[in-house]
Curated annotation (Swiss-Prot):
Protein name: DNA-directed RNA polymerase subunit omega
Gene responsible for this protein: rpoZ
Source organism of the structure: Streptococcus pyogenes serotype M5 (strain Manfredo)
Primary role: Promotes RNA polymerase assembly. Latches the N- and C-terminal regions of the beta' subunit thereby facilitating its interaction with the beta and alpha subunits.
Family (UniProt): Belongs to the RNA polymerase subunit omega family.
Class of enzymatic activity (EC top level): transferase
Catalytic activity of the protein: RNA(n) + a ribonucleoside 5'-triphosphate = RNA(n+1) + diphosphate
Keyword Nucleotidyltransferase found: yes
Length: 105
């Protein structure tokens, strides 16, 4: 029985079989957790779906893991700052409304 995608095809996409296993496992976990698929799948199982994505080149190992971590940190920080700004605007609006109510009385 020939398995698709073949190991030879997959090893052209990643540096080693160990990297392939790690990449497949991480992507399968992401798919199980509800991550958006990058393509339509022939397979039902998330592990095989991950291999299909690797074969098509839609999922790759990040060449610089520290840069990826820094990008994730920057995104989280930007989201935090946006949330703080939104909270500040809401508090200002509430204070303004209370001030206007105080003038009416």
């Amino acid at each position: 029985m020939m398995l698709k995608p073949s190991i030879d095809t997959l090893l052209d996409k990643v540096p080693s079989k160990y990297s392939l296993v790690i990449l497949q496992a991480k992507r399968a976990h992401e798919l199980e957790a509800g991550a958006t698929p990058t393509q339509e799948f022939k397979s039902v199982k998330s592990t095989l779906q991950a291999l299909e994505e690797i074969e098509s080149g839609n999922v790759v190992i990040h060449p610089d893991p520290s840069a990826k971590r820094e990008a994730v940190r920057a995104k989280i920080e930007a989201e935090r700052l946006a949330k703080e700004e939104e909270e500040r605007k809401i508090k200002e609006q509430i204070a303004k409304e209370k001030e206007e109510e105080g003038e009416k009385i």
